[in-house]
Amino acid sequence: MLWKSLIALCVIGAAVAEQTPVFLWGANSVAKPSLKTVSQVEFAEQLAALLEDHMVVAFEENGLSSKDFLCSNSQAQSCYAQLQGVSPKTYYTSVENPSEALRSVAAKREHNSIDASGKLTTPAKCAVGTALFVTFEDAAESREASLESHDAAIAAISKQFECKVAYLYLAAPSTAPVVQRRTRRDTAATTGGIMWKSTNQFQIFYTALLYNGNPITVTDLKLTNSSSTKLSVVMDTSVADKPITFDVVYNGGYFSLSNLVYDNNNFRSSGVNAPTTFSYSCGNLTLESAAVNNMYNTLSFKSLQLQAPFDGTYKEDFPFGDSWDCVGFVTPGILMGLFVVALLLVIMFVGVCWMMDINTMDRFDDPKGKTITINAAAE
């Protein structure tokens, strides 16, 4: 039984050990026969010698195999056009756990990643004896396009180091986490409508603008900085001398609309506000003016979204922040539902209490006892 257990452990150990290709360049190294697997210990000794006078940068490619080095693009050119021209270089067909071998001999280890633009997310400093592990962000593209973009990124990053550097291109360990990043997107669709922008200070989007149910056409937007906490916006319309004017005021981390005027009517806009890092969003915003002779005017925005960051670090054409919706968390429908549920609970509680108050009779007719006789006498 003991020797069977030892054989099983050896088989499991051989299965767990990862044997992947490694491409090394930037330093002289000993070539190995292509049919021979370089053990982890042997490869670690070779890397330890390199770390004495080199910095080692390891680019870890997810799922790298020998077939990837035969990759070609749509123009029948190699996906590794940049790596083909480096020297000196050595290709190892099979190396046992190359990443672990580097980790075991590197006293100083750093980790970094390459973003979608092909640049390091954190600037790296050149230091002899340091092992830098670089991963790639996953992108929704073909394997050929991914390898080709990684090849260009590796070539660009290799030129940034001024000290002696040995580079490794190897497979990422199967247990290594996959780097994923969320791309910021607009929280509301900005297609099929009208967008007005003023540098990096203010932008507004809507699909329709109505005054008492009649459409309004905006021809231009002008913005004036009244102060560091107040913007004055003028939206010229197709009707002469009838612009839409309003102020955007910053207070306590929020921006809000005030003094909205159109056609000499002042509309109530006290509820139009949001944090500066968010965008105010409303599917159907209808503003009303003060009633005159029991009549009032309405100004409606369909699919409205606007934002005033009050932050100079924003770029022009900045994307809208997360949506700050005009509909409150507790809507009338939710309130009605809660009221109905509470009413049903009260009815159920009262009914259960009544059922618990039902008492049985404390006296019963005994069939073995004396018969109860009731004489019915006529009076």
From Swiss-Prot:
What is one process in the GO biological process aspect for this record? Answer: vacuolar proton-transporting V-type ATPase complex assembly
Topological relation to the membrane, as annotated: Single-pass type I membrane protein
Q: Which GO terms describe its molecular function?
A: ATPase activator activity
Q: Where is the signal peptide?
A: 1-17
Give the record's glycosylation annotations as residue positions. Answer: 225, 284
Keywords assigned by UniProt? Disulfide bond, Endoplasmic reticulum, Glycoprotein, Membrane, Signal, Transmembrane, Transmembrane helix
Principal localisation = endoplasmic reticulum
Q: Which residues lie on this side of the membrane: Cytoplasmic?
A: 355-379
Q: Which residues lie on this side of the membrane: Lumenal?
A: 18-333
Please indicate which superkingdom the organism of origin belongs to. Eukaryota
Give the protein's biological function: Accessory subunit of the proton-transporting vacuolar (V)-ATPase protein pump, which is required for luminal acidification of secretory vesicles.
The UniProt similarity line reads:
Belongs to the vacuolar ATPase subunit S1 family.
- UniProt protein name: V-type proton ATPase subunit S1
Organism of origin: Drosophila melanogaster
